[in-house]
Amino acid sequence: GMDVQKQEIREAVELPLTHFDLYRQIGIDPPRGVLLYGPPGTGKTMLAKAVAHHTTAAFIRVVGSEFVQKYLGEGPRMVRDVFRLAKENAPAIIFIDEVDSIATARFDAHTGADREVQRILMELLNQMDGFDQTVNVKVIMATNRADTLDPALLRPGRLDRKIECPAPDRRQKRLVFQVCTAKMNLSDEVDLEDYVSRPDKISAADIRAICQEAGLQAVRKNRYVVMPKDFEKGYKSSVRKPGDEFSFY
């Protein structure tokens, strides 16, 4: 699945690292950065890892919250260190997951913690501006909340390509079910197409949870075969209906 997303991230990250001369001959600059956004569990992190696997580039993965440190100035210094490390080991890919934790739209900060987070964002903007296109370093960022990001980060020249990772369609759900159940011992009565055709909006992570829960139901009953009733229980326990709400005590 995700054929369009794979093609777009390949053009933005993989091809500039492996065939940079192609862009030079055409007379264009490859995208500097890529933003992956979409609901949780739709494969944003796995897509970035797949790109790193298909290139010989060094892969540096950082979670946005890791930049937020106890002492003043530590966060911006870590941002500089990450980009310096990438340049020293070029070609390299910097993957910043959950970037919304440090790159939300700026506002009048009233606390020291908020001001420090904004300094981290300023350093991130500065580092992405100072990129030399001849240095093969690409930046991939992922978030569930693209609507909260600072406009200065989203402008062309920093994050040139925005790739949406939506919930899987029917064909993609079928493929994910096939992958998740490939090693499972399923009964002949299990009809995966029934779960694929259901209208509930589920992510790839939900599908994996359904299959895991179905397997656990079989283990609980001390069976070696997963039955249709196991999948039904797994589906009901893993998929939330639109009206469902968690109870808070």
Annotated model-derived regions:
Residues 1-198, 202, 214:
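Walker A/P-loop NTP-binding motif of AAA+ ATPase domains
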Residues 3-4, 26, 191-212, 217-249:
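C-terminal engagement/docking regions of AAA+ P-loop ATPases
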